[in-house]
């Protein structure tokens, strides 16, 4: 059980801890499953975190919370094992502010 940003306890199936990065995409882009990228969608290695999984992502040190989101894209660095997830943001500035952080990715519900 983890406690989300609202203070509510939540159960999860499993968690992964490691580096996460951020990305954004130009207008008209689509994710690897054909969805329009948006805040709340993240890129993962679908062999570790299935597409459609409901996730909750927060910093190991508690300094940053991405919150509840869905595994909706494939991340090249995630496929290589370099990161756990690539978090979508609307702007380059938001991505730069996030940078690269050690995060806990809670898999609340695996898959669709």
Show the residue positions of the predicted features.
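Solvent-exposed, well-ordered loop and adjacent helix/strand elements within mature globular domains
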Residues: 1-112
């Amino acid at each position: 059980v983890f406690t989300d940003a609202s203070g509510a306890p939540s159960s999860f199936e499993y968690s992964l801890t490691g580096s996460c990065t951020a990305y954004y995409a130009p207008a008209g882009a689509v994710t690897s499953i054909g969805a329009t990228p948006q805040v709340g969608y993240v890129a993962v290695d679908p062999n570790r975190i299935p597409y459609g999984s409901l996730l909750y992502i927060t910093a190991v040190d508690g300094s940053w919370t991405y919150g509840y989101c869905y595994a909706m894209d494939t991340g090249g660095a995630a496929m290589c094992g370099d990161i756990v997830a690539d978090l979508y943001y609307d702007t380059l500035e938001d991505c730069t502010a996030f940078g690269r952080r050690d995060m806990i990715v809670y898999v609340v519900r695996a898959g669709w």
